[in-house]
Swiss-Prot record:
This is Arginine repressor. GO terms for cellular component: cytoplasm. Coiled coil: none annotated. The gene is argR. The keyword ATP-binding does not apply. Pathway: Amino-acid biosynthesis; L-arginine biosynthesis [regulation]. Pfam families: Arg_repressor, Arg_repressor_C. It comes from Salmonella paratyphi C (strain RKS4594). It comes from the Bacteria. GO terms for molecular function: arginine binding; DNA binding; DNA-binding transcription factor activity.
Amino acid sequence: MRSSAKQEELVRAFKALLKEEKFSSQGEIVLALQDQGFENINQSKVSRMLTKFGAVRTRNAKMEMVYCLPAELGVPTTSSPLKNLVLDIDYNDAVVVIHTSPGAAQLIARLLDSLGKAEGILGTIAGDDTIFTMPASGFSVRDLYEAILELFEQEL
């Protein structure tokens, strides 16, 4: 089996185990993965995977402290580049709309507001995962749209 295919299989198995919400230690996760045929797995690899996928320890329904994945996919982490938090950018005759990962809209809006009128931004309104951006005087909505695309390195 190819290395990348084996890695994808490991990631699927790892995520499936965490969804069970019954593992209270990294050692338990290592043993469960080894039982599934991942002989080369060790505690340090499990630790790195827990960090990579944003796993946290929380109480399950039985009030036991267990590892689990965040409820929302796409939750921002300290290592998320901002451009990865922007999912979609679109516009109409009046406004540019930016869709972000859940919880990231206010962070992205603050960045856009800090760029200000020099970049064509009059202001932003942010919810949890959606931002409305208004163009400043002298800028068209299309100009603002293209500037934001360039900022977040998105494709037209």
